[in-house]
Regions:
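Pyridoxal 5′-phosphate
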Residues: 1-145
Length: 145
């Protein structure tokens, strides 16, 4: 599908086009240097080196350690990693509560629902007519859990 110049795409929460700069940077990895970065062969090592270079670049931009940068395949994987990873860490207790919006994407709702099987409770915060969190309601949902 391609957009007519007179059309406006409004589902940018689902997918967005990449900028030409990003496309040009990624094109070699779609066409020539596409080796599995976990492999031991030369093409794999080239891919692994490119990923490590990108990881270092991102880390510098956000003033982080490269070991803290994790690349995922997309939004759903990122959401799962963030939510489940945080909940399964030692930072919080498995009896704690998770607050999500009432219009949350399934990529958050489904993993949150899975976490209820190990003791987490989901609390939903409603949104206003513009899809924005109702701050007063959100503040009431916050507690020691």
């Amino acid at each position: 599908m391609s957009l007519d110049l007179n059309e406006i795409y409004v589902d940018n929460a689902a997918t967005t086009p990449v900028t030409e700069e990003v496309l040009n940077e990624m094109l070699p990895y779609f066409t020539k240097s596409y080796g599995n970065p976990s492999g031991l062969y030369m093409l794999s090592q080239e891919s692994k080196a490119a990923i490590e270079f990108a990881r270092d670049k991102v880390a510098k931009v956000i003033n982080s350690q490269s070991s803290e940068i994790i690349f995922t395949s997309g939004g759903t994987e990122s959401n799962n990693l963030a939510l489940k990873g945080f909940c399964k860490s030692d930072i919080i207790d498995d009896q704690d509560e998770i607050i999500i919006s009432s219009i949350e994407h399934h990529a958050i709702i489904h993993p949150a629902e899975q976490l209820t099987s190990i003791g987490y409770k989901i609390r939903y915060c409603n949104v206003d007519e513009n899809g924005l969190i109702k701050v007063n309601e959100f503040e009431k949902l916050i507690n020691e859990r």
